[in-house]
């Protein structure tokens, strides 16, 4: 006779309930992200980039750098500043959807920027000066005050965590001095307690100049980099795919509609549903804006070209 059949039944019921909860939560997220209220209620772009939420984000100064949406699409984070290369007057803001409308922007951090979620969204990483990582910890429906999290004797720029727990960053941890931006490479880092191991992503995507502005896909299948950067910071957005041996393919351009003439392009980010690419574009501070463009179709076509 089977022992404790009731216990097996209870466990089966719990597993079923949890599975249904995950399915319902996933459907709810997808439902909101496809609703008219999603993305601050903005009309979705096609394959031609357009300014995201014009007039809604900057009350003074400029908006720039990486943005981040929560997985359910109901919280939006972005950076602001007075000038490109001055952290005075800079910081990070949050806009939340309250169930009926998007609330007004709220400052959640000062002088630290470039928000990036941990995979479980319990942490929001922010950077300062290219060499420090700060973190906000999830507390109920809000966030803790910024807490200092990591600093090394080398650069920790554009810090992002993939689903695997591997961190990606722009860094000169394998060469040069912390203040020498020309020695920064696209790198990955593993952290175990107080031990860190950092390595370059290789010569396929790195150059002898500064390499630090990027977006890594959560599953690490591709990386979007700011490439061909000039001494006056003009750059283009290119993509590289990770190979089976964990090396990277030769980068290729995201095309003339995104790389339309000389401009500084950085802060690249792909939305949680994979549909849209966000990035900052400007020829100077006077025309610096966050843009967005449909990305999933472009990504699929680039993958197909790589496979052919």
Model-found features: residue ranges?
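Short, conserved micro-motifs composed of acidic
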Residues: 29-308
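Bacterial Sec-dependent N-terminal signal peptides
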Residues: 1-31
């Amino acid at each position: 006779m089977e022992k404790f059949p009731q216990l097996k039944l209870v466990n089966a019921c719990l597993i079923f309930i949890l599975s249904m909860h995950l399915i319902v939560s996933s459907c709810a997220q997808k439902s909101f992200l496809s609703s008219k209220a999603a993305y601050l209620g903005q009309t979705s772009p096609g394959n031609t980039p357009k300014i995201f939420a014009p007039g809604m984000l900057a009350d003074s100064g400029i908006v720039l750098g990486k943005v981040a949406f929560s997985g359910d699409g109901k919280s939006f984070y972005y950076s602001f500043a007075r000038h490109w290369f001055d952290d005075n007057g800079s910081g990070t803001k949050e806009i939340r959807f309250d169930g009926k409308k998007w609330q007004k922007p709220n400052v959640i951090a000062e002088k630290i920027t470039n928000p990036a979620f941990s995979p479980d969204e319990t942490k929001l990483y922010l950077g300062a000066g290219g060499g420090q990582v700060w973190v906000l910890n999830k507390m109920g429906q809000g966030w803790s005050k910024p807490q200092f999290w990591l600093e090394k004797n080398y650069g920790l720029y554009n810090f992002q965590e993939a689903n695997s727990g591997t961190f990606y960053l722009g860094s000169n941890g394998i060469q040069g001095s912390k203040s020498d931006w020309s020695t920064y490479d696209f790198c990955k880092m593993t952290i175990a307690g107080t031990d860190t191991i950092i390595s370059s992503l290789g010569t396929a995507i790195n150059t002898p100049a500064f390499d630090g502005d990027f977006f890594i896909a959560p599953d690490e299948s591709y990386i979007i980099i700011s490439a061909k950067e000039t001494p006056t910071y003009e750059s283009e957005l290119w993509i590289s795919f990770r190979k089976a041996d964990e090396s990277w393919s030769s980068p290729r351009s995201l095309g003339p509609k995104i790389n339309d003439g000389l401009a500084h392009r950085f802060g690249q980010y792909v939305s949680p549903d994979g549909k849209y690419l966000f990035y900052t574009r400007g020829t100077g501070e006077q025309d610096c804006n966050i843009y967005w463009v449909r990305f999933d179709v472009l990504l699929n076509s680039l993958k197909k070209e790589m496979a052919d």
